[in-house]
Amino acid sequence: QAIIKLAKAYGLDDPKIAPHVPMDPNLKLKKGEGNEIIPEAECSYAAMVGSLLYLSLTCRPDIAAAVGVLSRFMSCPTAEHVDAARRVISYTYTTRELGIVHRRDGVNNPVLAFCNHEDSLELSRQQEPDLMTSYADADLAGDISTRRSTTSVCVLLNGGLVAWISRLQPTVALSTTEAETIATTDCVKLLMHLRLLLRELGREQQQPTIVYEDNQAAVKLTAMPEQSKRAKHYQMKVHFLKGMVKNGVYRYIWISTHDQ
């Protein structure tokens, strides 16, 4: 109902062209300057983004990345920003029947999407119900204004998302390995909270939670016994991750970028 109400408020409940993705991946938004900036009274940009932010935090993780980008321009929106926000609203309306599905068999394994039915059934039997898995990723210097990277995290339980993160990293990462390490740190901190929550609910995780990561250097970094010279400036995060691996909180599994 919230999606329908939002779309009707901005005349987007019957779009002529339904977008397949929330935001054009080739779109690079930047802060408006001077006469480019549109007053809030004329465009209601903050109101649109605020409504989308609510949806992205509660039930629509698929728009989290797009809304995160839009929220960076609340004080200086241009016509381009308004069009991008309207596109996200249009997307949420045309995909309003989509939802998060949790399965009783507890399958989180991405391999199941790339095998035949018999293999899928066999792998399903190997999965334990109520076992979390997660994905961590980052785009290096994705923000063109600050050159900061964006952390992306997804946590699945019984085949459906239960938690997600899409936010700008607080510092500028100097390499993909550093950006991915920062993202994994955020992921593991979230996993620590969720593991404690599941324990209180009587669903304690008996195994380390899998973190799928597509950067081989970041995966190898936590397995190195010695200190990496290239990672001296973020060694605290590396040692934190090493400690969490040792304590059985999580374990890395490399996955291809295509599957990530």
Pin down the residues of each PLM region.
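Long, low-complexity, charge-biased intrinsically disordered regions
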Residues: 1-260
